[in-house]
């Protein structure tokens, strides 16, 4: 059974994992605000990295001030993953256990493969472990 209540999801997994949940991908309304909340730098170079990566996923209309709610569900999932990947590299994070809850299921097969390749590169250099949750079971995928 999938967990759809954020409180239940965090109660169950947040002590062990960084949780990226499809139903709660962002806490602000634009990429610029999201990056500012995470880095507290105006117009961080991280923004350009995210937008460039978004173009590689054919999200050509991505912009720093576009309301995140105007993207499709799959586009939001991709942007959240790209933001997470960029932060891992930027902050030199190692040893993280990342739980993608209903995130990979929301993107096309092609984009899922591309995202997993991006994660694979980061996982190998930053000792990151990647997990998914399905039917109440955690499965390590990388």
Segments (PLM) and residue ranges:
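GG-anchored amphipathic helix commonly corresponding to the ABC/SMC/Rad50 NBD signature/C-loop
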Residues: 74-99
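ABC ATPase nucleotide-binding domain signature region
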Residues: 1-40, 135-142
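Conserved ABC ATPase "signature" region
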Residues: 47-63
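Conserved hydrophobic alpha-helix in the ABC-type ATPase nucleotide-binding domain
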Residues: 111-119
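Conserved ATPase "switch" residues in P-loop NTPase domains
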Residues: 120-124
């Amino acid at each position: 059974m999938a967990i759809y209540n954020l409180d239940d999801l965090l109660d169950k997994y947040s002590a062990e994992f960084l949780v990226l949940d499809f139903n709660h991908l962002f806490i602000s309304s634009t990429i610029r605000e999201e990056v500012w909340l995470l880095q507290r730098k105006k117009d961080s170079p991280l923004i350009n990295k995210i937008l460039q990566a978004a173009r590689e996923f054919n999200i050509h209309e991505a912009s720093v001030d576009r309301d995140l709610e105007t993207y499709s569900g799959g586009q939001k999932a991709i942007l959240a993953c790209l933001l997470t990947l960029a932060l891992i590299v930027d902050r030199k994070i190692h040893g993280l256990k990342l739980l993608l809850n209903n995130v990979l299921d929301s993107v096309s097969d092609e984009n899922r493969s591309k995202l997993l390749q991006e994660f694979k590169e980061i996982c190998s250099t930053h000792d990151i472990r990647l997990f998914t949750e399905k039917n109440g079971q955690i499965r390590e995928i990388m």
